[in-house]
Amino acid sequence: MTTHVILVARAFGAKGVYIEGKDEKMVKSILKVIDSWGGSSYFLVKEIENGKSIVNEWKEKGGTIIHLTMYGININDFQDRFEKIKYPLLIIVGAEKVEGWYYHNADYNIAIGNQPHSEVAALAIFLDRIYKGRELYMEFEDAKIKILPQKAGKKVIRSG
């Protein structure tokens, strides 16, 4: 699931991810995607030991912490605040049970609905709302593989 969250983060415009813990195989897989599909200077992947320290650093620097959770306020009720959010954003998505500390230290707990759902879907919808669909046209200059959109069929352009 973590790999899918990272792929969505990259494809939907996030500038990078922090991964709590070590997973060499997963990081290697993501770096391979970045090498082929681009984004090496745009999208950073960093393994960390303690997510709480990143949250505290982010707050000290004046950024905003968004925690995506089914227990938060509905994203539709948050819509008018998107223009007023202080950047940079740190978006927290958690697998399984997230510690209560994150709920209390996030600036906003936002739900993509109050039913059980995937972190992948929540992140995709949230980023799409922030970027208003512009992220769907994003291209990376250093991509070795690019898709040329087709009405029918598939066209892939390879370089390097």
Swiss-Prot record:
Provide one Gene Ontology cellular component: cytoplasm
Cite a single GO MF annotation.
tRNA (cytidine(56)-2'-O)-methyltransferase activity
Task: Tell me which InterPro entries the record gives.
Answer: Alpha/beta_knot_MTases (IPR029028), tRNA_m1G_MTases_N (IPR029026), tRNA_mtfrase_aTrm56 (IPR002845)
- Which terms does the UniProt entry file under GO BP? tRNA nucleoside ribose methylation
- Give binding positions for S-adenosyl-L-methionine: 68, 94-98, 112-119
Under the subunit heading, UniProt states:
Homodimer.
Described by its record, this protein's role is as follows: Specifically catalyzes the AdoMet-dependent 2'-O-ribose methylation of cytidine at position 56 in tRNAs.
**Family from the record:** Belongs to the aTrm56 family.
- Name by which UniProt lists this protein: tRNA (cytidine(56)-2'-O)-methyltransferase
- Native species: Saccharolobus solfataricus (strain ATCC 35092 / DSM 1617 / JCM 11322 / P2) (Sulfolobus solfataricus)
